[in-house]
């Protein structure tokens, strides 16, 4: 999932494709549209079973050619927080001076962040029962409580 983990824990217990337990409660959700972009904000208590009862808050600001993704984990007890961005199998990721460059055909997206970034093997599951090897960007945000940001810039 393209979301955060706290000490490796997901926001819910995923048992299989359609079996989910310990579902998080939505604490905040908002949408604000503009002439050329939008802002989405949401938070949940899916990590409340962990020490310090961390709350995850995400804000997405989208504008032509740019997406800002801001993650905050409020509370917590020093757990390591990571954010994951799954890449399509056709994408190739390479390190750049201030983050990563992701390419697919003629499209280039620069990922600029204050977090530590690595690339890991992952699975892309486009359909039930279908698993395709791919890569994911893993952003180590720091220890809870923590806030971090990644900016995705689309290059023509």
Question: In which residue ranges do the predicted regions lie?
Answer:
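CBM-like, beta-strand-rich accessory domains located in the C-terminal region of large
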Residues: 1-156
């Amino acid at each position: 999932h393209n979301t955060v983990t706290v000490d490796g824990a997901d926001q819910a217990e995923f048992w299989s494709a359609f079996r989910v337990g310990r579902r998080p409660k939505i604490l905040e959700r908002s949408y604000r549209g503009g002439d050329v972009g939008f802002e989405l904000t949401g938070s949940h208590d899916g990590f409340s079973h962990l020490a310090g009862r961390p709350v995850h808050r995400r804000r997405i600001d989208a504008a032509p050619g740019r997406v800002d993704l801001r993650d905050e984990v409020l509370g917590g007890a020093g757990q390591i927080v990571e954010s994951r961005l799954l890449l399509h199998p056709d994408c190739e990721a390479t390190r750049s001076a201030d983050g990563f460059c992701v390419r697919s055909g003629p499209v280039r997206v620069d990922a600029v962040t204050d977090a530590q970034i690595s690339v890991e093997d992952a699975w892309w599951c486009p359909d039930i029962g279908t698993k395709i090897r791919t890569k994911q960007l893993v952003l180590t945000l720091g220890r809870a409580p923590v806030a971090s940001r990644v900016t995705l810039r689309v290059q023509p």
